[in-house]
């Protein structure tokens, strides 16, 4: 659009916009934020607001759209949620006192990863991530600007980077120019992330002091530099950098967490139906965030797990004290985010009142914790800082009925400041003085309806109707003439008005200054407030886990160093909660030292996947310190969980079910150790039957011979059950069924040995397929079973067997070379991937005739 012949104000807009080409520029003009040119056109569509124009009669009118300043945040939120950036330009001087164009500057750039002041508060973290690559390893740093959390790690490959970003649910990723185009495409297209490019020149090492690798230091510096550049202020709430190692936690990919419904239900993308939903009896926003973090990162340190267990046990044993604790925590507000608002200079009187109310609860919480009389709880108590001096400051300074905005007044309590009290007295008594003057002049003048009114233009004045003008005293002076009346003033009234106006202006200015001073004092306590927030969040999560354990009759798991899994009458905690205790059928799970693989067979809908997920959730809950759903649990400590449960194409990246299966299987066999847990459900079903079965067998053998991880492998390939005769650490289990008078009942109980049937037709019957179709399927099944009984397991020696064994096991399929050549040619001509089942059977019949 043409931008010629523009006004000085528009030139100012363009000069500012030039520095923020990738952001919507909200340009403050009076009571509105205006957008112009392309920003206005696009914003009008996205925000569903009116599009008008500036200088409508000009040859090239400027497109314009605007939003009221008091409701701007909700519009900013919409743009941010859509993945855009917003630059906010404020008026830096009073327009009444400005000479020429009002000075304006951008005071903040809001991006998806730097949201602090949302109109829709959310207790979840909002992470901004920075990634750096040095040609060998990746540095990854992340920060929640709204809470001050700041962490860094280094990772070996991009797969780990992608998984960590997904686990963090990052909204924005900062890159240098060192990632490949393919990696950047994955982040943008497959993960729907906003990428920002930032070269690191950050020199302030105060927040990133420590033993970091160069790539970690660069990633952390990139993050800090971007945050300071967009927020344009010192952020005192940013916490010291925490270095963490992925290996210090139970490792799980995003796909694994999604398949297990850890923090949200994969089918609905909602919290309901997830482990997070089940375990969340927290009372604070800080506790909710920490609980989610614990679920995302279960521990691998036995000592740390037992510490959590011990406190949960103490809470369980004291119902009354725990109930008092829960009730007290309800009065705790989000200290972390309140602290960030203070740091950003955005905390209002209501924010400080919430902070003060929280601090008033802390002594009660501390006393309740002391009443448990437990050494493990005392460790928490000893670290609690009640900040009594800050609580006293807020309680004595801020009026409990203070408004949410600073400009409305009535913020500071009476008695806190003598000067402010004096001005308020003048305003309060001035009203009485005016009433006295009104009564005195009414009596002296004889004007019975004489009264004093007020407006902004004329101030205080006597209102005299035309019929009484002859009675107006000489000391009255005219201020305004109306059609039916006159407005008068007096020296006495003007004096009182002057005193009241001065008191009002001085009071407003002084009250603002006092509030700013108090907020500055609060800012000096931010580090102590953040430490208190961490302790209260920990207490909240532990009491939540105690409540859940008691409500659902969970038990305290044990841990062993013998590589043994013993779960007696275990339950899938989430399914049980949804179904109800009476409906759920528990299952025991057992792996002795010699057993590394359970091969589970049985029909669909019988409970194989639930059985596998049950084990995974039990491990996760146990290693995050929670009690678990079972009668007895004894587990080894796992270092990682790998799953492939539930088939789904990766439509975004164009990868088929089979490709996704193979990629996830590859990650498992490459990364798993003998301390890992692998759960594979129907691996290989995404390709031709024999291809799938061959791969499934090879993967099982590889895990058995080379990995040694505890593994549950569910399959429809019943032929694979014969592997138990050659793999010493593999056992067969199946889902029990009851067959009577042609009807089949799935018992949902795991039993030893392989399944004898798949009952696929029965599942189809349950699904409601037509009876004629089911009858035909029975006929075909009977014929197929008659023609060819189950294919025997392929006894091809694995790589660990000797070459002599290979020679001894080699079979000759053909009697002579001529027939062999003819059949070989026929086989080579077959296009297996494009054959229908009927064509395959016909071809097989023709080949059989050649023998």
Curated annotation (Swiss-Prot):
GO molecular function: ATP binding; ATP-dependent DNA damage sensor activity; damaged DNA binding; mismatched DNA binding
Domain of life: Bacteria
CDD domains according to UniProt: ABC_MutS1 (cd03284)
Pfam families per UniProt: MutS_I (PF01624), MutS_II (PF05188), MutS_III (PF05192), MutS_IV (PF05190), MutS_V (PF00488)
SUPFAM superfamilies: DNA repair protein MutS, domain I (SSF55271), DNA repair protein MutS, domain II (SSF53150), DNA repair protein MutS, domain III (SSF48334), P-loop containing nucleoside triphosphate hydrolases (SSF52540)
Sequence positions that bind ATP: 602-609
Gene Ontology BP terms: mismatch repair
Keywords: ATP-binding, DNA damage, DNA repair, DNA-binding, Nucleotide-binding
A GO CC term attached to the entry: cytosol
HAMAP family registered for this protein in UniProt: MutS (MF_00096)
Function: This protein is involved in the repair of mismatches in DNA. It is possible that it carries out the mismatch recognition step. This protein has a weak ATPase activity.
Family, per entry: Belongs to the DNA mismatch repair MutS family.
Protein's name according to its UniProt entry: DNA mismatch repair protein MutS
UniProt source species: Streptococcus pyogenes serotype M28 (strain MGAS6180)
């Amino acid at each position: 659009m043409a931008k010629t012949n523009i006004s000085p104000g528009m030139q100012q807009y363009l000069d500012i916009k030039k520095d923020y080409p990738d952001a919507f520029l909200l340009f403050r003009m009076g009571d509105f934020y205006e957008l112009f040119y392309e920003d206005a056109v696009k914003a009008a569509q996205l925000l569903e607001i009116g599009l008008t124009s500036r200088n409508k009669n000009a040859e090239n009118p400027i497109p314009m759209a605007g939003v009221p300043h008091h409701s701007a945040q909700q519009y900013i939120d919409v743009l941010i949620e859509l993945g855009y950036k917003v630059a906010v330009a404020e008026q830096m001087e009073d327009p009444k006192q400005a000479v020429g164009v009002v000075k304006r500057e951008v005071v903040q750039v809001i991006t998806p990863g730097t949201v602090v002041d949302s109109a829709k508060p959310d207790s979840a973290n909002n992470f901004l991530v920075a990634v750096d690559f040095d040609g060998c390893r990746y540095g990854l740093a992340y920060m929640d600007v709204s809470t001050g959390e700041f962490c860094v790690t280094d990772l070996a490959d991009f797969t780990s980077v992608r998984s960590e970003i997904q686990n963090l649910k990052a909204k924005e990723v900062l890159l240098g120019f060192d990632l490949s185009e393919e990696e950047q495409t994955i982040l943008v297209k497959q993960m729907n992330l906003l990428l920002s490019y930032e070269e690191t020149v950050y020199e302030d090492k105060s927040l990133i002091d420590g033993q970091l690798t160069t790539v970690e230091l660069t990633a952390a510096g990139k993050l800090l530099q971007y945050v300071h550049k967009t927020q344009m202020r010192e952020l005192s709430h940013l916490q010291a950098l925490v270095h963490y190692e992925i290996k210090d936690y139970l490792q799980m990919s995003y796909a694994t967490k999604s398949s297990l419904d850890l923090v949200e239900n994969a089918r609905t993308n909602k919290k309901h139906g997830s482990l997070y939903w089940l375990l969340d009896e927290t009372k604070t926003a800080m506790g909710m965030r920490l609980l989610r973090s614990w679920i995302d990162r279960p521990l691998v340190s036995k000592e740390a797990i037992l510490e959590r267990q011990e406190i949960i046990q103490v809470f369980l044993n004291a119902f009354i004290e725990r109930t008092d604790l829960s009730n007290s925590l309800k009065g705790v507000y989000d200290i972390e985010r309140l602290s960030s608002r203070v740091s950003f200079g955005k905390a209002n009187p209501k924010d400080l009142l919430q902070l003060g109310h929280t601090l008033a609860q802390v002594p009660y919480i501390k006393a309740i914790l002391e009443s448990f009389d437990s050494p493990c709880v005392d460790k928490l108590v000893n670290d609690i800082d009640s900040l009594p001096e800050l609580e006293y400051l807020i309680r004595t300074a801020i009026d409990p009925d203070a408004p949410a905005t600073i400009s409305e007044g009535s913020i500071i309590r009476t008695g806190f400041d003598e000067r402010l009290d004096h001005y308020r007295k003048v305003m309060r008594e001035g009203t009485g003085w005016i009433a006295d003057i009104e009564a005195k002049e009414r009596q002296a003048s004889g004007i019975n309806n004489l009264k004093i009114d007020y407006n902004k233009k004329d101030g205080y004045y006597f209102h005299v109707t035309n019929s009484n003008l002859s009675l107006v005293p000489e000391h009255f002076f005219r201020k305004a003439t109306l059609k039916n009346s006159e407005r008068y003033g007096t020296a006495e009234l003007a004096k009182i008005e002057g005193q009241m106006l001065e008191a009002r202006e001085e009071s407003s200015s002084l009250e603002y200054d006092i509030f700013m001073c108090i907020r500055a004092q609060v800012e000096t306590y931010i580090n102590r407030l953040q430490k208190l927030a961490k302790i209260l969040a920990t207490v909240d999560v532990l009491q939540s886990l105690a409540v859940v354990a008691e409500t659902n009759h969970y038990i305290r798991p044990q841990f062993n160093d013998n590589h043994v899994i013993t779960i007696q009458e275990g339950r899938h905690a989430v399914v049980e909660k949804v179904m109800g205790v009476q409906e759920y059928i528990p299952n025991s799970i057992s792996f002795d030292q010699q057993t590394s693989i359970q091969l589970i067979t049985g029909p669909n809908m019988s409970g194989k996947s639930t059985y596998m997920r049950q084990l995974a959730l039990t491990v996760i809950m146990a290693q995050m310190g929670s009690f678990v759903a079972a009668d007895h649990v004894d587990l080894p400590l796992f270092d990682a969980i790998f799953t492939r449960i539930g088939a789904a194409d990766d439509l975004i990246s164009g990868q088929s079910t089979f490709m996704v299966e193979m990629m996830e299987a590859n990650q498992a066999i490459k990364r798993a150790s003998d301390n890992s847990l692998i759960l594979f459900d129907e691996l290989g079903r995404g390709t031709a039957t024999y291809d799938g079965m061959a791969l499934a067998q090879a993967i099982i053998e590889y895990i058995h011979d080379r990995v040694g991880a505890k593994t549950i492998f569910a399959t429809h390939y019943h032929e694979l059950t014969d592997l138990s005769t050659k793999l010493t650490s593999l056992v067969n289990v199946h889902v029990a069924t009851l067959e009577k008078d042609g009807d089949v009942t799935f018992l949902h109980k795991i039993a030893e040995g392989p399944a004898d049937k798949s009952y696929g037709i029965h599942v189809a019957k349950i699904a409601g397929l037509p009876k004629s179709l089911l009858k035909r399927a029975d006929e075909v099944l009977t014929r197929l079973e008659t023609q060819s009984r189950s294919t025997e397991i392929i006894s091809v020696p694995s790589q660990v067997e000797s070459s002599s064994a290979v020679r001894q096991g080699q079979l000759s399929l053909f009697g002579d070379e001529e027939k062999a050549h003819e059949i070989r040619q026929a086989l080579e001509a077959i296009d297996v991937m494009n054959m229908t089942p009927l064509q395959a059977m016909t071809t097989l019949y023709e080949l059989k005739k050649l023998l």
